[in-house]
Amino acid sequence: MGRQTHSRALSVWANGERVGVWRLPTRGPMEFAYDPAWVASPAGRPLSLSLPFAPGNVVHKGPRVLNYFDNLLPDSEAIRKRIAQRYQTDTLDAFDLLQAIGRDCVGAVQLLAVDDAPAGVERIEGTPLSDSEIEAMLARTVSSPALGARDEADDFRISLAGAQEKTALLWHDGKWQRPHGATPTTHIFKLPLGLVGNKLADLSTSVENEWLCLQILRAYGLPVANAEIMTFGKQRVLSVERFDRQLHSSGQWLLRLPQEDFCQVYGVPSHRKYENEGGPGVLDLARILQQSVSAQQDIETLLASQILFWMLAAPDGHAKNFSIRLLAGGQYRLTPLYDVMSIWPVEGNGPNQWSWFKAKLAMAMWSRSKHDAFRDVQRRHFNTMALRCSYGANAEPLIQRLIEQTPEVIARVSAELPERFPGKVAERIFKGLKSSAATLGKMPPA
């Protein structure tokens, strides 16, 4: 590709207010400048803690700008390639991709041509879809378009971060709809993962696995995204209600709620989402959450999640799977938990399995050294982390509570399993959870 010969720009909007301009100069690093009216607005707040309001409205430049916007996109290069092919973008760069699909991003952000403005923000518009139409849409999500093929869905452009195949729709008036104009989506549809990783672990039941893990966390008292298993024709999905959407008090339109994940908070690229790849860890998250409007509760949720990830053998609790809701006046708080999956249903050393002995937490427990392998983590490490996170002298009351809750949690969630829920998934997750709780209960606290 030849050298860029002219400056390019996209305008950034939130709920009908212009936030600023993202610019790609002909030379030098990319830039982001807040609109003075947004800085002065009662709704105004930084896009990210890594891109704060600054005296004199100084323009932000460089990697933090790129990494904020790049983190709005899917992590997977294969998914990015499909987006580029479908919308015929010149490159896989964040600017090109978001120019094509940035109308409905995570949080409040909409990206439009620099001279455009979102129309119809204060109304809800959409086209109702039948189950067969949704089934066809889901099939298109995981396929590359035929040469020269275009259809109405090509004008439905959304950007969903993460490594998993997914799309999103609007739920309104008791119907699934494809939103129009400035109307946002309200639910994310996540498709089964299939074979994953170097050993091709069989996560074809990822929809049921994630649903069950979320119900378990909720039963322990942790805030989680609302989710439901749904079937459209032959296609099974996990429908996740977006907690970055809210019906306006008038009941007439949907608000987009500002939020960011912890890669964006720290201005790091998505390929560094795991701590062992240079990404944020538990102490980094806790450092931010100490200034939350609900600091003690948020840090407890963070610590409880790590204990339960260990009990569930859930290895994917990385920085992109924790987010903060950005509030007015520069305040913030932790969002509900999301994207949690256990390896217990596929644990083993054979083909299409995932060895527990080799699996790790995405974020390590630190004492005098690093402990992230499931087999190495001890109760005392959770206690040390509680002290280092300024939660308390230790995590013993929290640990004991989680252990004591486990039988009731298993009984309650087991009673709520949907019809035809795969027995192996439930049995192995419940068995692993019960065994981990017993093991944790026998470990010395120090």
Predicted regions and their residues:
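Anionic ligand-binding catalytic core segments
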Residues: 1-319, 323-446
